[in-house]
Amino acid sequence: MRKMLAAVSRVLAGAAQKPASRVLVASRNFANDATFEIKKCDLHRLEEGPPVTTVLTREDGLKYYRMMQTVRRMELKADQLYKQKIIRGFCHLCDGQEACCVGLEAGINPTDHLITAYRAHGFTFNRGHAVRAILAELTGRRGGCAKGKGGSMHMYAKNFYGGNGIVGAQVPLGAGIALACKYNGKDEVCLTLYGDGAANQGQIFEAYNMAALWKLPCIFICENNRYGMGTSVERAAASTDYYKRGDFIPGLRVDGMDILCVREATKFAAAYCRSGKGPILMELQTYRYHGHSMSDPGVSYRTREEIQEVRSKSDPIMLLKDRMVNSNLASVEELKEIDVEVRKEIEDAAQFATADPEPPLEELGYHIYSSDPPFEVRGANQWIKFKSVS
């Protein structure tokens, strides 16, 4: 009896040292999973599409919430650092579009491939880079994911090919990656992303044709955030049904503000490609809260009321949060704890990104050759020999 009382006393003493919210979360019984209805996708040249119900586990829900919050807070910190002139040059933020980058990653395998345009910070994080490496890249430091030489538009990770600065230029490259997957006999797909503004580029239609001709495992994905720079889709495109643009390629129009919709559509599209049927096209209807880039205030071609309406009615993070709380997958207190942890991670990363040294000037010529060339290469400074991977 004494031993039992002593054990109870130790447990109570330990609980007393923890915040009340943590004790409450630890003692509460949560559901392991829940089933949700999701919006039906519009289909093109498909007899059936992704399911309209899906199961979300508590583990996955917490993971998705943390990932989306991290991307959101990272982008807001980048905005702050840019306004302090610590980050310079081009910078395109993706806050508001978190369900796209996290949902796409949730629907594929780590061995699958992804290439996108210049709004790439979220994808870089989801493909495996730490926040500190991304922010350090934005500030041009040695600890950046491209060693401080790529900046906002040119970040890379394993099976992630950027970050590309030329509008639409990544789409033929994505088709080429899909060709490599098929040529090497690998059960892999390539997610090839572009925006609604780039959707009118001629090279995209050329890539459609080759991918369909050779039945490449390529998922063409149009992130339709309604505006190409400052031009609304209605003013730029004769048809805004981007999921039908492939004509002879099947297509899906997906609610890009709902991570579960994006996840299920991506799984469906990946399975279609892996079955050997060829490419498929996805249009993700989403919205960016910031302007096109940091030089764009974002309110000259749309109203503040429009932005606020999307924030209040369709925010991807709030949608997931409400689902999890209302279905007993998580508590408000638990999600607030994640928010606190994410904010600390972002602040620590920002400190690293401002304190880490810049790369030395001679490193400008590094990483041009895959291996050290057998001859001396002279650049602007004839006494510096360019190196490769060092």
Swiss-Prot record:
First-tier enzyme category under EC: oxidoreductase
Binding site for thiamine diphosphate: 118-119, 165, 167, 196-198, 225, 292
Entry function: The pyruvate dehydrogenase complex catalyzes the overall conversion of pyruvate to acetyl-CoA and CO(2), and thereby links the glycolytic pathway to the tricarboxylic cycle.
Positions where N6-succinyllysine occurs in the chain: 63, 244, 277, 313, 385
Protein name from the UniProt record: Pyruvate dehydrogenase E1 component subunit alpha, somatic form, mitochondrial
Organs and tissues of expression: In all tissues, but in very low amount in testis.
Annotated InterPro entries: DH_E1, PDH_E1_Alpha_Subunit, Pyrv_DH_E1_asu_subgrp-y, THDP-binding
Presence of the UniProt keyword Ribonucleoprotein in the record: no
Record-listed E.C. numbers: 1.2.4.1
Cofactor(s), names only, from the UniProt record: thiamine diphosphate; Mg(2+)
Regulation: Pyruvate dehydrogenase activity is inhibited by phosphorylation of PDHA1; it is reactivated by dephosphorylation.
Range annotated as the organelle transit peptide: 1-29
Organism whose genome encodes this protein: Rattus norvegicus
Cellular component, GO annotation: catalytic complex; mitochondrial matrix; mitochondrion; pyruvate dehydrogenase complex
Recorded catalytic activity of this chain's protein: N(6)-[(R)-lipoyl]-L-lysyl-[protein] + pyruvate + H(+) = N(6)-[(R)-S(8)-acetyldihydrolipoyl]-L-lysyl-[protein] + CO2
